Amino acid sequence: MNSVFTIIFVLCALQVAASFRQSFGPSMSEESASMQLLRELQHNMMESAHRPMPRARRVPAPGETRACGRKLISLVMAVCGDLCNPQEGKDIATECCGNQCSDDYIRSACCP
């Protein structure tokens, strides 16, 4: 008799657990819709990642190049003929790396 009640209790518990999951868990349609959305987002990201950039964005136009690090040192050496001697508290590294700076600016900021 005890085993019959145990079996009935287990079956009722399984039924309650299954109905609880259906009531509060995500439905299959919601789950598949979110998976579909995730796949679409991944597809769009992969498409844009493999799209080649136009040449105008890859290669800067003349006069738009910035000088940073060794490139700046080479530019100062070419303009001044010597290393930079900062004048007037100008920070040419920040200016020339952040924006395009002209030879005249380098002469006024560095050349003796």
Swiss-Prot record:
Q: Which residues form the propeptide?
A: 20-58
The GO biological-process annotations, alphabetized, read as: cellular response to salt; chemosensory behavior; dauer larval development; insulin receptor signaling pathway; negative regulation of dauer entry; olfactory learning; regulation of synaptic assembly at neuromuscular junction
For this chain, the Swiss-Prot or TrEMBL PTM comment says: May be processed by serine endoprotease bli-4.
Q: Which PROSITE patterns match?
A: INSULIN (PS00262)
Tissue specificity? Expressed by ASI and ASJ sensory neurons.
Disulfide partners? 68-97, 80-110, 84-111, 96-101
Phenotype when inactivated?
Severe reduction in Ca(2+) signal in AWC neuron and in chemotaxis in response to high salt concentrations.
Q: Gene3D superfamilies recorded for this chain?
A: Insulin-like (1.10.100.10)
Name the InterPro entries for this protein: Insulin-like_regulatory (IPR052335), Insulin-like_sf (IPR036438), Insulin_CS (IPR022353), Nem_insulin-like_b-type (IPR003235)
Where does the record say this protein resides?
Answer: Secreted
> Function of this protein?
Probable insulin-like peptide which negatively regulates synapse development at the neuromuscular junctions. Probably acts as a daf-2/InsR agonist ligand to prevent dauer formation under optimal environmental conditions. Acts on AWC sensory neurons to regulate high salt chemotaxis responses.
The protein's name is Probable insulin-like peptide beta-type 5
Species name for this entry? Caenorhabditis elegans
Q: Source organism lineage?
A: Eukaryota, Metazoa, Ecdysozoa, Nematoda, Chromadorea
